[in-house]
């Protein structure tokens, strides 16, 4: 191939959006001071932080006082989920079987939880949370197969149980659904800088700090605010939302093409809902092929893709998401498109994939 490597792993981290880069460079010389201080530099930093919060609130259609900047999406997940659990005072966390490991680890830390099953598309298969649930954790869309969840519908039948929504995979790409009490998002997933997460807590939600508080601007999250990074994250989110319809339609058409052509390869299964899904990603599994070997060979040919869930790939364990769905767990590839992905890049990937799969199968005698 020509033109350098093709990055097809935007679901792990989207390249920095031009709006984020421009804003970050400009803010580095202005947002360094402590926004709690009353001197001029501190007041300037506070104004910048408040502006970032207002931009995020408008982009996500929430109130500015419902927005808290955190140091990562994982921290936002832990704060949001465990804060609702603590606010409920008793009961057990319930979570869908396809949640990100950040949710699973938080539930374990809180004493364990109840797993809610999903169907073969990865969608929650129950109408109401189990008895004794303190908080129900359901992602807005799955980070591995893209299937969206009926968040508003689940909330309507939750019987007063608060709902925590992990929106890290979808924020900016899809409008936030209704019905949640707290939610989390991650800047680098939409083209903002890494190291910035969003904790969203609805006005009136029964949320209490699950960890020691800090006397900062916003007591929901501890630590010194990274004002330049927060501004850059807000600028990227604003830009991504503004271009969402055009970019999303283009990505959806490209992914539709991938789903169709990949399914033509013998013994390949495409996972997730083909329609109600994130526009930019698709996961498929190849029987008789090792996922790590497939990713390595594709990388050698210039195509960067992922295998398995990002939360389990480093441990070389099968994807708990695919296992919960009852589909193939090995030999899987997740392809996810950047905002500027081109038809030629996708075509190039699809041209080399069949021969790579055939060669790897031949090496193991299948």
Where are these predicted regions, by residue range?
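Pyridoxal 5′-phosphate
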Residues: 1-366
